[in-house]
Regions:
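Generic hydrophobic, helix-prone segments enriched in Leu/Val/Ile
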Residues: 16-20, 78, 103
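Active-site nucleophile-adjacent alpha helix/oxyanion-hole segment immediately C-terminal to the catalytic cysteine
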Residues: 1-49
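Noncatalytic regulatory segments and standalone regulatory/sensor domains
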Residues: 92-109
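Short, solvent-exposed coil/turn linker segments
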Residues: 12, 61-65, 90, 94
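Catalytic nucleophile-His microenvironment captured as a short glycine-rich beta-strand/loop
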Residues: 71-95
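Mid-chain, well-packed structural core segment of small domains
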Residues: 36-79
């Protein structure tokens, strides 16, 4: 989670770790609590976009999201089950291949 956020924001891993730790202490949240990192993005001015659905009301995979929804020249933090990943300039960046996972909510950075 810290890796994805730091990559998307262009910050160091240590900077994001410290920011999340301090915010977590202030709000009584664990460092990796989803409410903590969602609040972090909100405080920085990034709004959560709702989970996209296809015309037949199915969820997009990360690969489909990158091809069809992600904006060229933009960075997106994408929530998938128990994980967040980054799509930057329509390309997936992660330590493992999660292109077949379903997309939840996302943030445009």
């Amino acid at each position: 989670m810290i890796r994805a956020i730091s990559f998307a924001l262009g910050k160091t891993w240590e900077e994001v770790y410290r920011d999340l730790a301090e915010q977590g202490i202030e709000n009584g949240l664990m460092l990796n609590d989803r409410n903590n990192w969602k609040l972090y993005l909100k405080v920085l001015g990034y709004n959560m976009e709702r989970m996209p659905k296809t015309l037949n009301n199915k969820r997009y995979t990360v690969e489909q999201f990158a091809d069809e929804i992600a904006r060229k020249g933009c960075t997106h933090i994408v929530k998938i089950a128990n994980h967040i990943t980054v799509v930057k300039d329509k390309k997936l960046y992660d330590t493992w291949n999660c292109k077949n996972k379903c997309v939840g909510n996302y943030w445009i950075i």
